Amino acid sequence: DAYSGEYNKVRDNVFRTNTSLAWLLNKSWITNLKFDASIYYNDNNSHAHTFYSYASEQPAVHATEEGYFMANKLPYTYFADQIIDSKELDYAASLKYEWNRRFKTVNSNLKAGVQWKATGNVGEGEYYKDPSLAPNGYRPRPYTTYPYMHNVSLYAEESLSFPVGNTMLRLMAGVRWEHLFIKGTKYKNLNTLSPRFNARWQLNEHIAIRGGWGITEKLPSFYTLYPKQEYRDIQTFGFSYNKIESSYIYYSQPYTLLHNENLRWQRNQNAEIGLDVNIARTRISLVGYFNRTKLPYKYASTYTPFSYDVLQLPDGFTMPTNPQINVDNQ
């Protein structure tokens, strides 16, 4: 903004690299083996130069420990420079095995593999060029303080197709197992098992019946498994002096999302059956399905009483023009 002096700058750079190797072995026990690996880096940086103006003094609490603290004072007018520095850096690798074979009239395709992915951020997160001008409630949370999330998965899938009289039947069954590794999380057994089954019966070139069933287990989000550090600030004392100046004492209390040792993983069950008809270049599909979610995640509040001191000036006390204030953090 040329008039106010405000401006915003954004930098967004993406780097991707990947490699893929395939071995076409065509042996009696293997058809091919494929290896993939990739690196993804997203450098995203935003800079906001913002003007602030207040009619009265504004407190700003930035304490990171529990206790009583005097709030900083923000100027009546000032420019603040907010930086959000994100540097997402992800790694991935996979090994895939495939075996195609034929037993008389039965065609079989077996796929199996292992996948690994690591996701994280090496950026500094949100910060201010001048920390004393950070707004009330701000605390630095560098992205580097959060651990990488590693996902390892194993999967297998078998597809069969064979004639049944003058019709063709296709069957597919698969299972996927995943495990998360997050350093420092309190949750154990971060693994899921997701089976599935599909079938398609091609009665003739115009009519087919199909159906499927599967279960998908879903883990909670990263910030549930590794909660963010949050803060609660409660004003316990405030006073004015020198006619236009004010000071405030706050009780600050760090907290995080509570660990639920009885938390069970959300499970989605899906089933469907359908009829596909092709007539005169027109495709008609009739599908019936059933979806059910067990143990859905939801946030709940629990209340734990705690105490803190609220102070008041004695009756008749007059605050001096330039008071010396000492705060006992405990």
Regions found by a protein language model. Name each.
Residues D1-Y7, N45-Y54, V122-D130, K183-L193, ...:
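Outer-membrane beta-barrel translocator domains and adjoining extracellular loop/strand segments
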Residues A2, Y54-Y78, G120-P142, E230-L257, ...:
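Surface-exposed loop/turn segments flanking beta-strands in extracellular/periplasmic regions
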Residues Y3-Y7, F79-I83, P140-T144, Y187, ...:
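Short, flexible coil/linker segments at or flanking structured domains
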Residues N8-K186, Q202:
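Face-selective signature of the C-terminal outer-membrane beta-barrel domain
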Residues F35, F197, L275, T321, ...:
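Intrinsic-disorder/low-complexity regions
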Residues Q82, E88-S94, L263-R264, I279, ...:
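Outer membrane beta-barrel strand-and-loop segments of large Gram-negative receptors
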Residues P131-L133, S221, N326:
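Short, solvent-exposed coil/turn linker segments
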Residues T145-R292:
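Structural signature of Gram-negative outer-membrane beta-barrels, strongest in the C-terminal barrel
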